[in-house]
Amino acid sequence: MPVRTVIERGPKDKRSVAFSIDWPGWSRGARSAELALETLESYRGRYRPVAHLAGMAGEFAAAGPLEIVEDRVGTGSTDSWGISFSPSVAEQGPMGEVELERAITLLQACWAFFDGVAARVSPEMRKGPRGGGRDRDRIIRHTIRTESEDFAKQVGLRIPEGAALTPDGLRQHREVYIVALRAYNAGEVKRRMRSWTLPFLIRHSAFHTLDHTWEMEDKDLSAQGGA
């Protein structure tokens, strides 16, 4: 079966994004739609561990070529950062139970992959051309806090700053977040999202997690004896 893929172009056409609808987190941005598609395809192998952790290795291996099902204009974030920041046509309305549970399983696999990479990469990360960039712990803190203190608000969750940065706090956040995703889909959360939708929230959470996981992999200095 082809991989349903969406192209999202920035309003000023400075950057574009290509992402998979059915595999949350498999998303890449580039200077053009064509390059975004090429980059997305090149990351197929890098997404494979996530599918494996989700128990979907066979399904992912059988996935066919990328098939564009929507070509849309995104938001300013698409131009500025090369990321998708709004839901596609396919990500509207409530999710079916099977669809929701599949997406949640893949999100949990993204978390597990993130945790595994964070545990094995070097504390110091390779710097950029001008010597800038974050170390591993700053990447971890940013990834966790953005999800737990920002994204989770979309489904009615509020936690103290930094509360998810401890092992117990992170485990509790993830458990409560999953409960909240299910509750929102069931209509049990009174305050509804304005511009986001539940499928987009799950996809965006997965993308943000994987984007920084791959960043840590790419900047890992372990092979060079990094501390």
What are these regions (language model features)?
Residues 7-9, 78, 85-86, 110-112, ...:
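Short, flexible segments with low predicted structural confidence
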Residues 83-88, 121-122, 148-151, 184:
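Short hydrophobic/aromatic-rich motifs at helix boundaries and adjacent loops
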Residues 68-80, 168, 178-182, 192-194:
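A broadly tuned preference for mixed-charge, low-complexity surface segments
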Residues 4-33, 37-56, 115, 123-171, ...:
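Short, contiguous alpha-helical
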